[in-house]
Every structure is written in C-alpha cells, then in structure tokens.
C-alpha cells in the first residue's frame, strides 16, 4: 500500500494548531478544511493530463487538462464532512458520495447506517475523507462498500493516522493509497489516537 505522510511545513503548522486542547469549534473546522485541501493537492499530484487546443485571447493555444477517471469525494459521516469543502476547492466538479458509519464505543467495531453513492462509481476515482484513521475499522468497511459497488480506484485522506489503523488497512486493502498529515504514536486503551486530535467529530460540530 502506498503510504504518504505529507511533511509540508504548512500542513505540520496547521495540524499543530489543531492539537490545542481549547481550540474553538470555528477554528478547528477551518483548519480541518485547510489541511484537507493540502492533502488533496498531494493526492492528486499524479493525475494524468492531456494536451488540448482551446481558443485563447490571441487565437488557438495548446493547454494541458486532466484526463482519465472523474472523481467522487466520499466523506465518512459525520466527521468527514469537515474535510469535504477543502477537497472540493481543488476538484469543484467532483460528485459526492456519502457513507455513514459509526464506531461502537464498547466493541470499537464499525456500524454502517447510511450510504448514498453516485451513479457509475465504477468509472470514478474515490477520494475517501475522514479526519482519523484509528483502528481502521470504519475505513475498511467504507472501502469494502465502494469496491462492492465496483469502485477500484481509491485514495484515502486522513488528518491523523495510527500505526495500528495503517496496518489493518494495508492488510485489508493493499491496493489503496493513504495520504495523511501525521502518523501518530498509536492508540490508547479506548481506541483513541495518541497524541491525536481528540474527538474530531465533536470538535467540528461543536457537540461537546
């Protein structure tokens, strides 16, 4: 599995701000979108282009445009919504597929409860976004769902990843690509990433 920890100074700086324990909902939400945007820039750096001729201001001109599969952005509800706008800054015409999965706090197992995928998803590349890759259960379940629908071109974008989640994802889906702003120390006894960001969903939506 291709694993990319984005080490750009802006990514590290913004992620560091997100780790503040008393960060406001507004600021956390803004930074989640900004880091999501920077991860998208990295994840799409290998998209193929083709030369086409357009009518420029002074006559025909040859330019490069993206070719190949169109993109669907797949936020995992609910926290993934916090990164979605940042992703769409770079691919504003992308279609949006939504997957709802929550983690049982006792068993730590993923529980699917909603899905709405775009049509012809088998012809698209999926950018799956979720702030945290902890145990990997929710991400694996989401990718299972996408592959069952025919989508086989998948890139995962997360703010923070635990080594345990990376290992689980690689074992289940070695063909996907992972882009993260940080590979953190690991999980605590409750399945939370250390040092992590806390509960990203609560911080994005202001529910705690």
Curated annotation (Swiss-Prot):
List of residues binding 5-phospho-alpha-D-ribose 1-diphosphate: 78, 103, 130-138, 199
GO molecular-function term, one example from the UniProt record: GTP binding
Record InterPro entries: PRibTrfase_dom (IPR000836), PRTase-like (IPR029057), Upp_B (IPR034332), UPRTase/APRTase (IPR050054), Ura_phspho_trans (IPR005765)
Regulation: Allosterically activated by GTP.
Gene3D superfamilies, sorted: 3.40.50.2020
Binding site for uracil: 193, 198-200
The keyword Glycoprotein is assigned to this record: no
Keyword Cytoplasm: no
EC number: 2.4.2.9
Protein name: Uracil phosphoribosyltransferase
Pfam families, alphabetized: UPRTase
Note on cofactor: Binds 1 Mg(2+) ion per subunit. The magnesium is bound as Mg-PRPP.
Highest taxon in the source lineage: Bacteria
Swiss-Prot/TrEMBL catalytic activity: UMP + diphosphate = 5-phospho-alpha-D-ribose 1-diphosphate + uracil
Phylogenetic lineage: Bacteria, Pseudomonadati, Pseudomonadota, Gammaproteobacteria, Enterobacterales
Cofactors required: Mg(2+)
Keywords: Allosteric enzyme, Glycosyltransferase, GTP-binding, Magnesium, Nucleotide-binding, Transferase
GO biological process, one term: UMP salvage
SUPFAM superfamilies documented for this protein: PRTase-like
Annotated pathway: Pyrimidine metabolism; UMP biosynthesis via salvage pathway; UMP from uracil: step 1/1
Gene name in the database record: upp
Family: Belongs to the UPRTase family.
Function according to Swiss-Prot or TrEMBL: Catalyzes the conversion of uracil and 5-phospho-alpha-D-ribose 1-diphosphate (PRPP) to UMP and diphosphate.
